[in-house]
């Protein structure tokens, strides 16, 4: 077929994917079933551009009439339909379809479900806008859109104080990242006179500029909850479980990593920024893995595993392998969404209980849920031939064959080991053993649970093989390496299994890991200590500086001190006059009498 027609079909399919999603947003009260069906239809439509790309290796850019057209600067509505867009869009749509179907059961008793589904749909559309943007303005619109929608969805249960605090916390931390992105946009506008991504990468890819690259790294740190700006991610678990599934799998938290992948040409020839990205990712992945190992809340364990995997993606970007980071982002979306839906099924059936120490033997009552949770955890561990294995193994191989940073290598290997440890602990505590809950606890699995979990389970099983076999690597791969490097992932898996068995051994007196259960006291230091110190300093400033200076120097005491010397002088003179006047009068009287007597 003529390439012109293929380009037309590809562009039309990409636009139709978005257009199909618009009716539920325009309608005042769309039904949940209609919204879910339209997302399903949109997912199948999005396969058309993907099929054309896989067959013809074709990428297009759809540009429309400029919004602003100045002498040296213009902004046009432009969509970049490349491999990142055509691959990630069907994945995001499929996951959203599964989450919406699951929500029809999970949140059946909630009011305003039409608004909830609108929020989910807007969340998805803003993410698609972000990944398909071909200029920084559209990218910023999608970037802010996912931030706003995450705030609305995390605070969905607005009657709960913790939900509102968590939503505000997410916004506050993301504001820091937004400052970095805006700083880079201003620099681009003033130095390149363009916000078009293709022009920017063409002009700056061979040079090193600190301000724009640092701004993009700060933006990714805030949005993807990297170390330093990470406390909002576990706090976001106060929202509904379907929100957590969408937030952690294919929307907001991966937006920061995707930003670095999209703008990687600016980083690829800048060793300093690559080193910073590598060390930041390594620090994030080890801290999150240590916290996940000591948590007992099922949703927080999965949330910290998300943070750890995001750190692993940042490591891949820092190794100058954005292609591998994108592959891991795609495979991670499937099993992370499935793990959250499994946790939602367990929580709902266990009467809103989230402590894994109170779960056990759930494989008898919730067989499909525990099976899918086992598959998702195994894929997260990197068990051979599951989705996570193909991408995790590539990251470890790239890290082992790199001469960049030995500390990052050691820390990342420790984090990968701990990933298997907390995933195995989650499976053992939930699925095996004797029941630790009431025998009359009602548990059931219906089609609203089964169908989404089955779809995501298939994605967790085969997505890694399909993606790595159909997408060629961007750089030449190393085909010869020592056996110990090739098998290091398997060795880490075995070691971590031993660690997890040790952690779940009930015969050993368990000690409280207060340091990591409290997230290394980082939220207390940042949220409590800093505010407490600022209040103390403010109090001292007002009471010991302002009040004292007013009272002692300017106010009543100051006036009294200033008037003390004159009043003392006058008083002394008054006392002097009081003592001398009678003597003078007596002397004058004597003189007068003496003169009279003569």
From Swiss-Prot:
Its main location: mitochondrion. The chain crosses the membrane at residues 6-26, 32-52, 84-100, 113-133, 136-156, 241-261, 272-292, 301-320, 325-347, 370-390, 409-429, 456-476, 478-498, 576-596. GO terms for cellular component: mitochondrial inner membrane. Keywords: Electron transport, Membrane, Mitochondrion, Mitochondrion inner membrane, NAD, Respiratory chain, Translocase, Transmembrane, Transmembrane helix, Transport, Ubiquinone. It is a multi-pass membrane protein. GO terms for molecular function: NADH dehydrogenase (ubiquinone) activity. Core subunit of the mitochondrial membrane respiratory chain NADH dehydrogenase (Complex I) that is believed to belong to the minimal assembly required for catalysis. Complex I functions in the transfer of electrons from NADH to the respiratory chain. The immediate electron acceptor for the enzyme is believed to be ubiquinone. Belongs to the complex I subunit 5 family. This is NADH-ubiquinone oxidoreductase chain 5.
